[in-house]
Amino acid sequence: DDAAADVIADGLVAGGLPVLEVALRNPHGMAAIERIAARGDVLVGAGTVLDREQLRQALDVGAAFVVAPGLDEEIVEAALTAGVPVLPGVMTPSDIQRGIRLGLERLKLFPAGAAGGLALVNALAPVFPGVRFMPSGGVSTANLGEYLAHPAVFAASGSWIAAPARIAAGAEAVAEAAREAVAVRAKAGMGAGR
């Protein structure tokens, strides 16, 4: 709802991490993207994009990027045609090769934790040296630093920063978790540019 969107966005901005993927599996996802995009101080994208219609709707309400759980060529091609960054989910070498054929160099590794976590990144990175990954699924404060320290990782995605208990506690609770993630990123030697 609007109040939760405001708490999350306010907390991320205050915590120095003004980037948010809103999962469209939430019935309020499109409205949240529209509300947060209108603020202008948060880079907001649509997550769990499953088809071209969701992609179109997300772009219409202001999504600056799209993330999909899998590699769907139609979604990737439509996003690239629209000039919007797209991060499709991959888990296997075949998925990664399909992404490379579509011109992608950055891919969401999903579900990272269930698929082997850092061991999977270690196995895939030397085979695909031109690809950078965003682990998602099973990422937490416990393993965030290990992921971000890996040169094949450009970002990580997780819901712990905006967990329901933090949202209920307010923007400062979200900001505290965001600050912790920013500190982990810095400790891992990852600047904002990677």
What is each model feature region?
Residues 1-64, 81, 130, 141-142, ...:
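Conserved N-terminal beta1-alpha1 strand-loop-helix module at the mouth
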Residues 1-2, 26, 46-52, 68-72, ...:
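Glycine-rich beta-to-alpha transition loops that act as phosphate-gripper elements at the mouths
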Residues 51-61, 94-102, 119, 125, ...:
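Catalytic cores of alpha/beta
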Residues 65, 69-115:
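Histidine/lysine/aspartate-rich catalytic loop segments that bind and position anionic ligands
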Residues 65-75, 108-118, 140, 144, ...:
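Glycine-rich phosphate-binding active-site loops on the catalytic face of alpha/beta enzymes
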Residues 79, 86, 118-128:
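CoA-thioester-processing core
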Residues 103-108, 120, 127-130:
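A contiguous pocket-lining binding segment that forms or flanks enzyme active sites
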Residues 111, 125-128, 157-160, 182-185, ...:
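Short, well-ordered alpha-helical segments in soluble proteins
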